[in-house]
């Protein structure tokens, strides 16, 4: 807690996966850009993606032990209370030593002990939940939070307000029309042709690849071209057609989105948020692992009229030919979906989360 100074010290907690680290970094960057006086610290584990990404971005990473919630009664469950208490003590020490004014949690292993520690130190805390189905740390944290922000309407968290996803700057600032010619050049495709962008995430590509292998000729025959990120692991055969471009991965998603008119992809929270913020119609194939959060993320977009869904188990070349190809030919349906997507996604997620944090500090 600050004495006599007007600067604020923020502790952002989260990590483990890109889904937790990226929104955290977007908010950290927003806070840092707003004031050079304020201090932005990040709380994470040694094991998570944050251990590399946070220092790389120029933030100090404070460490907390990784203590997963027990899922079954076993030895780990028996040891959980002691290990969790230790993690809470670690965070309390960080809060006191750095005179933290507010804690912001993004889910993941670091968040649960951060919420408990903040309460015990009488420091306000804010919860941000990226998925339509919240994780356990955020379910528990939201009950006592000064403010809770969610990405998708209908996320079952106490007192939740829809604030959207804090997105990467290159997506927030993207002018798709202005970059389309450059994007066509980069990927070797014609910027004048309508383009279907297909990607499956690092793990989820195989199912999409198998379906596309049998469906791409029908898509091309319908007058479309395809940019398909097939992943490193899957040896998909590139048929060598000028209108069907297969690449292992895309490191410039801003340019891929600039070329795209429709997206076929998995339904991670960041993916759905970026596609919606850019007003792109989408067909989602939710990845059927984890606790079903992708299906719920996609359902939020479908309810709004911004997307369609094909369940993972039903994704075949025939299904793409019968469902995707007619949609690609329906200009009115696509423009309705594009208009609807602005109600699902926003480019203001970072600003909205920072406004929640400001509220918590001012209380």
Regions flagged by a language model, labelled:
Residues 7-18, 37-90, 163, 311-313:
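Conserved nucleotide-sugar phosphate-binding/catalytic loop shared by glycosyltransferases and other
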Residues 20-32:
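Short amphipathic alpha-helix
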Residues 43, 48, 53-55, 176-185, ...:
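Donor-nucleotide binding loops and adjacent catalytic segments primarily
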Residues 121, 258-261, 274-285, 304:
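Conserved donor-binding/catalytic loop of nucleotide-activated donor transferases
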Residues 119-181:
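Active-site-proximal region of nucleotide-activated glycan assembly enzymes
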């Amino acid at each position: 807690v600050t004495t006599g100074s007007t600067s604020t010290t923020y502790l952002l907690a989260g990590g483990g996966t890109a889904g937790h680290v990226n929104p955290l970094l977007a908010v950290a960057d927003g806070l840092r850009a707003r004031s050079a006086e304020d201090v932005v610290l990040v709380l994470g584990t040694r094991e998570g993606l944050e251990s590399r990404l946070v220092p790389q971005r120029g933030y100090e990473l404070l460490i907390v032990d990784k203590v997963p919630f027990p899922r079954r009664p076993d030895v780990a469950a028996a040891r959980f209370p002691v290990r969790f208490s230790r993690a809470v003590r670690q965070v309390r020490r960080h809060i006191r030593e750095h005179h933290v004014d507010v804690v912001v949690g993004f889910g993941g292993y670091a968040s649960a002990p951060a919420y408990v520690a903040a309460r015990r130190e009488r420091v306000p805390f804010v919860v941000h939940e990226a998925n339509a189905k919240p994780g356990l740390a955020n379910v528990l944290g939201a009950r006592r939070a000064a403010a809770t922000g969610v990405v998708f309407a209908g996320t079952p968290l106490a007192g939740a307000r829809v604030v959207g996803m804090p997105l990467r700057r290159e997506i927030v600032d993207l002018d798709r029309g202005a970059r389309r010619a450059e994007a066509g050049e980069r990927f070797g495709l014609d910027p004048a042709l309508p383009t279907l962008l297909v990607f499956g995430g690092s793990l989820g590509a195989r199912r999409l690849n198998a379906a596309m292998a049998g469906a791409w000729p029908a898509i091309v025959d319908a007058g479309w071209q395809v940019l398909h990120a097939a992943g490193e692991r899957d040896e998909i055969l590139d048929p060598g057609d000028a209108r069907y471009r297969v690449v292992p991965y895309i490191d410039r998603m801003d340019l891929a989105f600039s070329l795209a008119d429709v997206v076929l992809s998995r339904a991670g929270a960041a993916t759905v948020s970026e596609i919606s913020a850019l007003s792109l119609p989408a067909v989602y194939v939710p990845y059927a692992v984890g606790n079903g959060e992708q299906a719920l993320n996609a359902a939020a977009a479908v309810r709004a009229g911004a997307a369609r869904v094909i369940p993972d188990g039903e994704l075949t070349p025939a299904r793409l030919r019968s469902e995707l190809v007619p949609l690609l030919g329906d200009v009115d349906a696509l423009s309705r979906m594009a208009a609807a997507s602005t109600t699902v996604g926003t480019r203001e997620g970072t600003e909205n989360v920072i406004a929640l944090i400001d509220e918590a500090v001012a209380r």
